[in-house]
Regions:
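Histidine-centered catalytic micro-motifs
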Residues: 9, 28, 32-33, 45-55, ...
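N-terminal small/glycine-rich loop or linker at the start of catalytic domains
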Residues: 1-23
Length: 118
């Protein structure tokens, strides 16, 4: 008997930088390319963190939209999960990209919400 499985990848994470791992995909084009390679290898779900030019974490909805567009073009069946994490950012900032999450599953870390966010 074969048990179906979903392979998911988190290609970047929120903490590592290129100084930690030179091959880390941090730009939009690098993230699309890395996601496409994972898709071709069998991954069905990708968890996305976007970065600012200085490689620090970002909640920029436009960056998420660019990554989403590239993934849709090259990996049409892939499930995309945007990270809503964001140390030091408000819940509304961290969730601003959700308007672009039409074809995926957003992730919201309840442990990061404060009483004032609920």
């Amino acid at each position: 008997m074969t048990t179906p499985a979903i392979i998911s990848v988190a290609i970047t994470g929120s903490v590592p930088r290129k100084k930690d791992c030179p091959g880390l995909p941090v730009t939009v084009s690098e993230q699309i390319e890395s996601t496409h390679a994972a898709y071709e290898a069998g991954a069905a779900l990708v968890h996305i963190h976007v970065r600012k030019p200085d490689e620090s974490p970002s909640s920029d909805p436009d960056l998420f939209a660019q990554v989403q567009e590239g993934i849709r073009k090259h990996c049409p069946d892939m499930i995309v999960q945007f990270s809503t994490g964001g140390r030091g950012r408000s819940q509304s900032e961290r969730g601003a990209m959700l308007k672009h999450a039409r074809y995926g599953i957003p992730r919201n870390r309840i442990g990061e919400l404060s009483q004032h966010d609920l």
